[in-house]
Each structure stands twice: as C-alpha cells, then as structure tokens.
Amino acid sequence: MDRMKKIKRQLSMTLRGGRGIDKTNGVPEQIGLDESGGGGGSDLGEAPTRIAPGELRSVRGPLSSAPEIVHEDMKMGSDGESDQASATSSDEVQSPVRVRMRNHPPRKISTEDINKRLSLPADIRLPEGYLEKLTLNSPIFDKPLSRRLRRVSLSEIGFGKLETYIKLDKLGEGTYATVYKGKSKLTDNLVALKEIRLEHEEGAPCTAIREVSLLKDLKHANIVTLHDIIHTEKSLTLVFEYLDKDLKQYLDDCGNVINMHNVKLFLFQLLRGLAYCHRQKVLHRDLKPQNLLINERGELKLADFGLARAKSIPTKTYSNEVVTLWYRPPDILLGSTDYSTQIDMWGVGCIFYEMATGRPLFPGSTVEEQLHFIFRILGTPTEETWPGILSNEEFRTYNYPKYRAEALLSHAPRLDSDGADLLTKLLQFEGRNRISAEDARKHPFFLSLGERIHKLPDTTSIFALKEVQLQKEANIRSTSMPDSGRPAFRVVDTEF
C-alpha cells in the first residue's frame, strides 16, 4: 500500500509539472489522461514517472457547453501496471486514472430568447444563420450582458446600419434635419427616419444630442419610441416608430370638432406620458399639437424632445426662449428663467382648450400680443392675483388695460363643470399654482374612464382595457387616408 501511495504522489507531481493550464479562453482547460496505461520503468521509486506523448490531452470546449468529467475505474496491480498491461494482479485497488470528456449538447436558442435578452421587438426578423451561429457560440447568454456586448450583438442583427432601413417618402425638412417615411427590413414595419446633418465645424446640434440622450431612457406607452440610432460621418439618423398623424392634423380632419369622449382620452394620455417624464425629472418644454402623435388606434404619444431637458433641481435657471409662443406661459413670456415641471402644464391647458373648441386659446404673433390675449381672458394680473407682478419691468412697460377675468365656460361651452375646473387649474399665472400632471390625471373629469386605467403599467396602452375605446368622429374627413389604407404621417417639427 505504501508503494501505491508513492506511485499516486509521483503521478500527481507529473500532472502538475508536465503541462500548464491554458487560460487563453478565460477558463482553465480540462486535462485528462489517455486510455493507455502509464508505461513507467521497473523501479518507479528511483525515477519520475514518464507519461508518453498523447497521454495528456487538453480539451477546450465552447463556453456554452462546459465538458463534464467522467471518471472510469481502472484496476491496477501491485507492480503499478494496469490489468491491460499485465494479466496477473495480486492486490486490486481502484484509481481514477482514465478521464474521458463528455460535452453537453449545444443549447437550443430561439428567437424569443434573443428578443428577451436584448429587449427587441417581438416581430424582429433575425438575419439568416444568426440563430445557428448563436447555438455554436452564444456569448450573450454565457456572460453578463455588458453594454459593449449588447452593442456588438445588436450590430450583428442589423441595428445601427443605414442599409437596414428603406427610405420611402420625404415628409419634411428643417434647418438641420430631414424626416423620411421609411421601412425596417428587420420588422417590415414603417418607421420615421429623422436624418440630422452634421456640420464639420459644429458637429451634431445640441438639440439632437439632447433628444437622443433623453429618449433612450424614456420607456412609456405615451412617449414615442426611439428604435435605433445610426451615426455616420455626415449624418445622425434617429429611427422612430411611425405614427399616422399628429394632433393638429387630427383636428383638421375632424373639422376642428373632436368627440368630447376622445378629447378626454387624448388629454388623459398626454397627462399620463407627461407625469412619467416629470417623475424622471424631464421637462418637455415644447408642448403643442404638432408634437403629439396619434395612431389609428387612438394612442397619443409625446414626440420631439429636441427642446426637452433633464431637470436637476427645481430652481435651476433655464432659457426662456422655449415653447412655441401660443403655448408659452405668462411667467416665461415675462422673462422668468426660474421654473420646473409647471412650464409644461400651461401648454397642457392650452391644448385641452384647443381640442374642446377647435381653435387656439391665445394665438399671439408677438410676446406683447400673446400676453394681451392671455390677460383679456384671464384678467390683467394685480398684486393680489400675482404677487410681485408690479415689480416686473417688462409688465410695467407694456402698460396693459385692466381686464376682468372671464368665465372659461363661456369660451368653451362643450366643457362640463369638471372640465372647466381642470382647465382653470392648468391656466394659472404663477407656475407654482398650476396643477401637476400626476394630480391632473386623477381629476374628477376622468372619473368616467374607470379605476383600472390608473393601475396600468407604464408601458401598457390604455386601449388594452376593453372598456376604453376611441369613439367614431362625426365629421372625420377621409382625405388623410392614402390608398394603402394608412393615414398620412404628419412630420414632427424638425426646426432646431
């Protein structure tokens, strides 16, 4: 028995010293002995055991199928030879000399596995041979999914490449960008391609960078989805989901008279998407009907985040040259740069009124005229209604007449008392007095939509509820429906 222990010890020393472990693939190689017995000399105690070439073998398998070690017992005699080498053996012991490697069968990977792992659309069409390639070598399943690994995997599928998308029609053009209707080869779905020209001296416009940085982190049923980003030397292309029209075109197609039930659904979705943005500390800052996209189902989505920005603290100073004039609040018109989420709520009130009446509430062409329209309906502010207003130099300069506030119901007769109350709470002079998006969507005006609509996950459409349906418009025009049966896409404002 002492001699056997000596043999085992020497064999172990030989295995450790005979060949190092290759770590080139990130994991140790599996080492085993060949089927043949160890052919040592007659006196194993005098010399180290010699292993014939080929007896040590390394097995390197793919990461996805780590080999399983199977020990097969060999009978060895007291002279150190196996029964294969010597037919006579007086004392038999079992020793795990022979090691055979057994590979697990490759993992079967499905399209659903890839979609879930990489957060891809369910209708994605993977390139030919991609599944077979992953079956042989599947790093996205065998390693933690780092940002770099995810980027490489998406590129292999076709994301980030211009050739993945087919341009169909030119929808509009701005100072820096052109928007095209397009089609994705990956999903066969329509997309909107916002192609931003890169000036060599200036690089990408800050509005484009801002839009990308914010949208890639905003995941909500009422916010337009950014599908892809393609960066070349000459352009930056943003690939958005395609929606049929914007709210301005919807109003035009309805003869400026939207069914009041649909007004309620659109307003709720606007508030729902905006409340999510504000929870993420993002201000849109450019709300207007042209930036609210609507599809055939009636889903409304916030778009064009070119002027949006992340809000760090409520008192941060921002530019007052934001928000299209008609939807700009009076405190911003008078030069205030001290604002937070309330800047968006004034615009919501203006859009609510426009949906209910079919006309803009304050259609001024200059800042002075815009303020005049506001004060003529809501009343000229005083120290009682707007503390500190008389110390505002711009306000004193304009020297507006002393208007008395008018009842909003007289201007929007289709609103009920709850609707008028909500509109009043949105159209407050001081931002701090305006109702928040979160509180506004819980207003009694929306009671008829039921309780379940408030419990939906962020990424679920309100139309997932069977009790929520868009009603047919009485005056809808069919001119916006092309021969394909899909309504025309209204281009998002591309001016930067």
UniProtKB/Swiss-Prot annotation:
Phenotype of gene-disrupted mutants: No visible phenotype in females; they are viable and fertile. Male mice are infertile, due to a defect in late stages of spermatogenesis.
EC number, as in UniProt: 2.7.11.22
UniProt effect for mutating S153D: Reduces interaction with CCNYL1
Gene Ontology molecular function: ATP binding; cyclin-dependent protein serine/threonine kinase activity; protein serine kinase activity; protein serine/threonine kinase activity
Residue list for modification Phosphoserine: 12, 36, 42, 64-65, 78, 82, 89, 95, 110, 119, 138, 146, 153, 155, 391, 478, 480
Keyword Cell wall biogenesis/degradation: no
Gene Ontology terms: biological process: exocytosis; growth hormone secretion; neuron projection development; positive regulation of autophagy; regulation of insulin secretion involved in cellular response to glucose stimulus; spermatogenesis
Binding residue positions for ATP: L171, G172, E173, G174, T175, Y176, A177, T178, V179, K194
Pfam families associated with the record: Pkinase
Effect of S78A: Increases interaction with CCNYl1
InterPro entries listed in its UniProt record: CDK, Kinase-like_dom_sf, Prot_kinase_dom, Protein_kinase_ATP_BS, Ser/Thr_kinase_AS
Biased composition range(s): Basic and acidic residues: 69-78
Entry keyword annotation includes DNA repair: no
Catalytic residues of the enzyme: D286
Region Disordered, residue ranges: 1-95
Similarity annotation: Belongs to the protein kinase superfamily. CMGC Ser/Thr protein kinase family. CDC2/CDKX subfamily.
Function: Protein kinase that plays a role in vesicle-mediated transport processes and exocytosis. Can phosphorylate CCNY at 'Ser-336' (in vitro). Plays a role in the regulation of insulin secretion in response to changes in blood glucose levels. Regulates GH1 release by brain neurons. Phosphorylates NSF, and thereby regulates NSF oligomerization. Required for normal spermatogenesis. Regulates neuron differentiation and dendrite development.
Name of the featured protein: Cyclin-dependent kinase 16
Primary gene name: Cdk16
